C-alpha cells in the first residue's frame, strides 16, 4: 500500500498552489473586477481584498464524450407560434435563464456566477501589476554586496539556537524503531510464551520459565541501552546567504500647500501621493521616500506631516525644487542612487518664479534623475508654470512627464499612465 506524506511547509495553506493556478487561469476576469472596484472605491479604501464574480459559463470544463451518432426516430411536439428559421427572443430579466439578480420568477433555470474572495495582497498585486518605476538602472557601490538569509532545509550541524525540535524527535524516534524493532519482536514472543507457561504449567516448566525470563530481561536491557536521543538525531534549521540583486532608489514627493490650493485640490493631491506611497511600499523593498511640502518656503517633513499638516502660505514652487537639489547633493549621489521625483500643484506660482523652476529643473535636477512626473490639479486654463514645464518636457522627453487632473476620478488612470511598465 502506498503512502503519500505531505512535506510542504505551508501545512495550514495546502491549497495555495491550486489557488495560484486558479488566479492565473482567470486573470483577465480578476483584473477587470479589480479595475471596477478601483473605480468605486476611494483611495483610502484600496488596501483590502475584494469579492470576484466569474460567470458559470466561463468556468465550465471541456469534456470528451461520445457523439450522438446512429439512426433514431423522434416525435417532437409542434407549435402554433414559430416556423423554421424564426429567432426566439431572449426572455425578460428575472424569467428565463435564471442566474443572479433581484426579483422572483416562476419559470426558467440557470446557474449563479461563481463568487470568491481575493485577499488584500492579491488585490494590490493585480492593481499594481503593470506598473514600475521607469528607467530603473541597477547601481551599487563598488565592493559592497548585500545578502539575505534564506531557508535551505535542514542540517546535521548547527548552533543550539537553530535546533529543530520536531525534526530531531522524529529522527530519534525513527532511529529507536530501527534499532530495537527486531528485539521488541523477540521480546513480545518471549512474553507471550511466558504468559502461556504461567497460565498452563507443565512438567519442567519452571526451568524453561526461568530461562525465558532471563532472556527477556537481557532483551529489555538491550532495548533500554538504546539512547532516547543521540547527537546523530539532532537536526538544525539551515540558513544560507543569498546575494540580493537590488537597485537603490529614492522617490521625492513634492506637494504644493499654498493658499491657492483649496481643500478639494489638496485632497486630490493627497490621494495621488497616498496611491504613490502605497505603490512604492508594495513593489520595492529598497527604496527611500522624501516628502517635501512647500508654499513660499519648502520643508522636508515626515509622512504624517506631509499628508495631514494644516500649514499654508503663498506660492513659490522653486523653493521645493531648490530643497530637492540640496538633499540630492547631500544624501543621494546620482552615481549610487536611482532618483525619482513626483510633484503635485494647482499651477499657480509667484510672478517670474516659473522661469526659475525651468532653470533649476533643466540645470540641476533633470540631469541627475531617472524620471520626474508633474501633475497639475485644476479645471482652469494653464498658467506660466505649465508653459515652463512644457519647455522641460521638450528638453527631456524620455525622463519628464506631465499630466492634468480635474477630479479624483482621474487619479488612477493618470497614475497608471505615468508609471506604466516600459517594454525593454
UniProtKB/Swiss-Prot annotation:
One Pfam entry name: DUF444
Residues passing through the membrane, by range: none
InterPro entries: UPF0229
Location of the region described as Disordered in the Swiss-Prot/TrEMBL record: 52-109
Compositional bias annotation for Basic and acidic residues: 58-69
Family: Belongs to the UPF0229 family.
HAMAP family: UPF0229
Name of the protein described by the UniProt record: UPF0229 protein Sde_0732
Annotated source species: Saccharophagus degradans (strain 2-40 / ATCC 43961 / DSM 17024)
Amino acid at each position: 500500500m502506498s503512502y503519500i506524506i505531505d512535506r510542504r511547509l505551508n501545512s495550514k495553506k495546502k491549497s495555495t498552489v491550486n489557488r495560484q493556478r486558479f488566479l492565473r487561469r482567470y486573470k483577465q476576469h480578476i483584473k477587470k473586477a479589480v479595475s471596477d472596484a478601483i473605480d468605486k472605491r476611494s483611495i483610502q479604501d484600496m488596501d483590502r481584498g475584494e469579492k470576484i464574480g466569474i460567470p458559470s459559463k466561463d468556468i465550465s470544463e471541456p469534456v470528451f464524450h461520445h457523439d450522438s451518432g446512429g439512426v433514431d426516430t423522434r416525435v417532437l411536439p409542434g407549435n402554433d407560434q414559430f416556423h423554421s428559421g424564426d429567432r426566439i427572443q431572449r426572455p425578460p430579466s428575472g424569467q428565463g435563464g435564471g442566474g443572479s439578480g433581484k426579483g422572483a420568477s416562476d419559470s426558467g433555470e440557470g446557474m449563479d456566477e461563481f463568487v470568491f474572495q481575493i485577499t488584500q495582497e492579491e488585490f494590490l498585486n493585480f492593481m499594481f501589476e503593470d506598473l514600475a518605476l521607469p528607467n530603473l538602472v541597477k547601481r551599487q557601490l563598488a565592493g559592497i554586496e548585500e545578502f539575505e538569509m534564506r531557508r535551505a532545509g535542514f542540517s546535521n550541524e548547527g548552533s543550539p539556537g537553530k535546533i529543530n525540535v520536531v525534526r530531531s524527535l522524529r529522527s530519534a524516534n525513527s532511529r529507536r524503531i530501527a534499532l530495537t524493532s527486531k528485539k521488541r519482536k523477540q521480546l513480545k514472543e518471549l512474553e507471550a510464551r511466558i504468559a502461556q507457561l504461567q497460565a498452563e504449567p507443565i512438567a519442567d516448566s519452571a526451568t524453561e520459565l526461568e530461562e525465558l525470563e532471563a532472556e527477556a530481561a537481557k532483551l529489555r536491557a538491550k532495548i533500554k541501552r538504546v539512547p532516547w536521543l543521540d547527537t546523530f538525531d539532532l537536526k538544525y534549521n539551515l540558513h544560507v546567504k543569498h546575494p540580493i540583486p537590488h537597485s537603490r532608489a529614492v522617490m521625492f514627493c513634492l506637494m504644493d500647500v499654498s493658499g491657492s490650493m483649496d481643500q478639494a485640490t489638496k485632497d486630490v493631491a493627497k490621494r495621488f501621493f497616498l496611491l504613490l506611497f502605497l505603490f512604492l511600499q508594495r513593489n520595492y523593498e529598497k527604496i527611500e521616500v522624501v516628502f517635501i511640502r512647500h508654499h513660499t518656503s519648502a520643508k522636508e517633513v515626515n509622512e504624517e506631516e506631509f499628508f495631514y499638516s494644516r500649514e499654508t502660505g503663498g506660492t513659490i514652487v522653486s523653493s521645493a525644487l531648490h530643497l530637492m537639489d540640496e538633499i540630492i547633493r547631500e544624501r543621494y549621489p546620482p552615481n549610487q542612487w536611482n532618483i525619482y521625483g513626483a510633484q503635485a500643484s494647482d499651477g499657480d506660482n509667484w510672478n517670474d518664479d516659473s522661469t526659475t523652476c525651468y532653470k533649476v529643473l533643466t540645470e540641476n535636477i533633470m540631469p541627475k534623475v531617472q524620471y520626474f512626473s508633474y501633475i497639475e490639479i485644476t479645471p482652469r486654463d494653464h498658467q506660466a508654470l505649465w508653459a515652463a514645464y512644457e519647455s522641460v518636457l521638450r528638453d527631456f522627453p524620455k525622463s519628464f512627464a506631465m499630466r492634468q487632473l480635474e477630479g479624483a476620478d482621474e487619479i488612477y488612470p493618470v497614475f497608471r499612465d505615468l508609471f506604466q511598465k516600459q517594454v525593454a
